[in-house]
């Protein structure tokens, strides 16, 4: 990875942004979709605008709300705790979720549903209890619990779970968004990180090229899109002026991802504020 050349205007913007630099500690309680979103490019994107992130990912592949809750209650050591500090990643196997939660005074902790269930409202029945237990364990009294709104599968997906949505990307996308809109207010989660909306908007401009397999994001373009979304959400700074991107993403694609990210942030705010 490298940072692209900066114009005088870009340098002026960076100086201005640097005056408002932030240090933010964020923990994702997730699965492979949080791995796609926070473990690649996010730290570098924030650093490019003068911000510092401590990033944690409580990882179990395919983990659902119910399994996270059960793990928290029983103390199972099923997690890989991936942590990025100063741009360096560590991976601690056989970790407990309660230990991960108290590892740092996290400013933001995100929750998410396993992708097959992400658009199924009945699968959210234990979200309130999970949120309560996480919040009680958190050592930062001002921690904010947020939701990671994930993406629909590519239209060509052969995943068996896709059949629950009629093997339709549009149907799955709408189900994910509508489920978040209906279920999150019930448990007091007010804000979403709209990775799934960014991915869907990017598909409109770039085609259905955001995935590397039947469900996961592509290693460069897709993961970059999710990381841009997290960066703008966490820092509150427009991604449009960010000067970092992976070498294997073209300048045109960067512009489209930036546009999709910025639009997704506005769109999710309207969705969450709309009458239910």
Over which residues does each language-model region extend?
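Conserved catalytic region of serine esterases and O-acyltransferases that act on ester linkages
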Residues: 214-217, 221-223, 227-276
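Alpha-helical cap/lid subdomain in secreted, periplasmic
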Residues: 93-219, 232
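Bacterial N-terminal signal peptides that target proteins for export
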Residues: 1-7
């Amino acid at each position: 990875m490298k940072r692209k050349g900066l114009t005088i205007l870009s340098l002026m913007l960076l100086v201005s942004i640097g005056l408002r630099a932030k240090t933010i500690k964020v923990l994702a309680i997730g699965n492979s979709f949080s791995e796609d979103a926070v473990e690649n490019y996010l730290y570098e994107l924030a650093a490019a605008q003068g911000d510092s992130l401590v990033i944690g990912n409580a990882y179990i592949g395919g983990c659902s709300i119910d399994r996270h809750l059960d793990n928290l209650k029983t103390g199972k050591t099923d997690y890989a705790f991936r942590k990025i500090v100063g741009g360096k990643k560590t991976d601690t196997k056989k970790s407990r979720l309660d230990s991960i939660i108290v590892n740092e005074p996290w400013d933001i902790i995100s929750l998410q549903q396993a992708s097959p269930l992400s658009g199924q409202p009945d699968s959210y029945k234990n979200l309130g209890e999970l949120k309560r237990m996480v919040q009680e364990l958190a050592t930062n009294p001002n921690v904010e619990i947020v939701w990671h709104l994930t993406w629909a599968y590519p239209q060509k997906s052969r995943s068996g779970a896709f059949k629950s949505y009629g093997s339709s990307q549009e149907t799955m996308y709408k189900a994910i968004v509508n489920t978040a809109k209906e279920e999150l207010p019930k448990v007091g989660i007010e804000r979403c990180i709209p990775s799934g909306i960014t991915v869907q908007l990017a598909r409109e401009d770039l085609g259905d090229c955001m995935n590397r397999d039947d469900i996961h994001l592509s290693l460069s373009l897709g993961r970059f899109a999710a990381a841009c979304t997290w960066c703008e959400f966490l820092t509150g700074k427009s991604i449009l002026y960010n000067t970092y991107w992976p070498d294997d993403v073209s300048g045109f694609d960067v512009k489209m991802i930036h546009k999709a990210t910025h639009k997704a942030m506005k769109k999710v705010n309207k969705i969450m504020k709309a009458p239910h």
